[in-house]
């Protein structure tokens, strides 16, 4: 059976769009981040999970909640995650669907593609509470 295409008008996830991830950019430890994904209803999603992989740590799954329909064809799922310590957290999404386990994997433009296997993850940078950029670096670019 051929599966319908995902509409190019509807992004499944976009890490650079506050509708899908808020706040945008690096966050302070203890700051809660909202993650939202938009799934086509034909997928028959029964469960969605945020996959978290702290740098050097073990993978964890956080259950996402069904958050309503966008229209007759798409539905929102969301969850909140609060990083407890500074560092990098790699993340992605795992789906339990009518067609089996599926994943949302990162594309070069930071949006998501539906995949039958795990793939590239997104990165969340978490900095120490109270960290302040030195005045001499403000507005600069560091390589």
Where do the protein language model's features map onto the residues?
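Short edge beta-strand/loop segments characteristic of extracellular beta-sandwich folds
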Residues: 33-42
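The feature marks proteins involved in alpha-glucan
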Residues: 1-34, 54-143
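Solvent-exposed loop/turn segments flanking beta-strands in beta-repeat/beta-sandwich domains
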Residues: 43-50
């Amino acid at each position: 059976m051929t599966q319908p295409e995902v509409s190019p008008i509807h992004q499944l996830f976009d890490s650079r769009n506050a509708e899908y991830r808020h706040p945008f950019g690096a966050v302070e430890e203890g700051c809660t981040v909202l993650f939202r994904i938009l799934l086509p209803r034909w997928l028959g999603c029964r469960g969605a999970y945020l996959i978290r992989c702290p740098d050097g740590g073990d993978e964890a799954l956080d259950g996402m909640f069904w958050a309503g329909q966008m229209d007759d064809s798409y539905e929102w799922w969301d969850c909140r995650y609060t990083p407890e310590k500074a560092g990098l957290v790699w993340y992605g999404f795992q789906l339990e669907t009518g067609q089996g386990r599926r994943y949302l994997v990162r594309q070069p433009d930071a949006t998501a593609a539906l995949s039958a296997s795990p793939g590239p993850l997104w990165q969340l940078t978490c900095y120490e509470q109270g960290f302040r950029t030195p005045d001499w670096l403000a507005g600069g670019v560091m390589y």
